[in-house]
């Protein structure tokens, strides 16, 4: 637990730009909201093979916020990856379940965080609302 706290605090310290703590945390909160909105849209769309698009879109929108948004997107994406791995391994008893999907999701998240257009992952026929 101490190690996790130290890692989070160090990443916070290194992630803060010259703009100050307030803008960094504001960007982080807004980036978290962007990821949440993309997740909610993914659930609402309920469209097959659209997960990568929504992951890329959420990370792209968080990246547009600034360094705080990028930091929040990395923390949330990494936490989701590890939590999903723990669930698969210890709760479901499956070690490599969804490994290809997880790697494709990571690629989409990195694509969005790098500032590239998330529509690269947009599936055909997804309603324009999303």
From Swiss-Prot:
It is found in: Secreted. One of its GO terms (cellular component) is high-density lipoprotein particle. Disulfide bonds: none annotated. Residues 121-130 have a biased composition (Basic and acidic residues). Expressed by the liver; secreted in plasma. The keyword Secreted applies. It comes from the Eukaryota. GO terms for biological process: acute-phase response. SMART domains: SAA (SM00197). InterPro entries: Serum_amyloid_A, Synovial_Prolif_Regulator. The keyword Metal-binding does not apply. Residues 1-18 form the signal peptide. Induction: Upon cytokine stimulation. Keywords: Acute phase, Amyloid, HDL, Secreted, Signal. Its main location: secreted. Belongs to the SAA family. It is linked to Reactive, secondary amyloidosis is characterized by the extracellular accumulation in various tissues of the SAA protein. These deposits are highly insoluble and resistant to proteolysis; they disrupt tissue structure and compromise function. Apolipoprotein of the HDL complex. Major acute phase reactant. This is Serum amyloid A-4 protein. The gene is Saa4.
């Amino acid at each position: 637990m101490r190690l996790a706290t130290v890692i989070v605090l160090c990443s916070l310290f290194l992630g803060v730009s010259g703009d100050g703590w307030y803008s960094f945390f504001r960007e982080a909160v807004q980036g978290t909201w962007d990821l949440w909105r993309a997740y909610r849209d993914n659930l609402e769309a309920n469209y097959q093979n659209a997960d990568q698009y929504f992951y890329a879109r959420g990370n792209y929108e968080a990246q547009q916020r600034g360094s705080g948004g990028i930091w929040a997107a990395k923390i949330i994406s990494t936490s989701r990856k590890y939590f999903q791995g723990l669930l698969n391994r210890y709760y479901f008893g499956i070690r490599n379940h969804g490994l290809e999907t997880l790697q494709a999701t990571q690629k989409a998240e990195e694509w969005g965080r790098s500032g590239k257009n998330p529509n690269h992952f947009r599936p055909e026929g997804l309603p324009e609302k999303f």
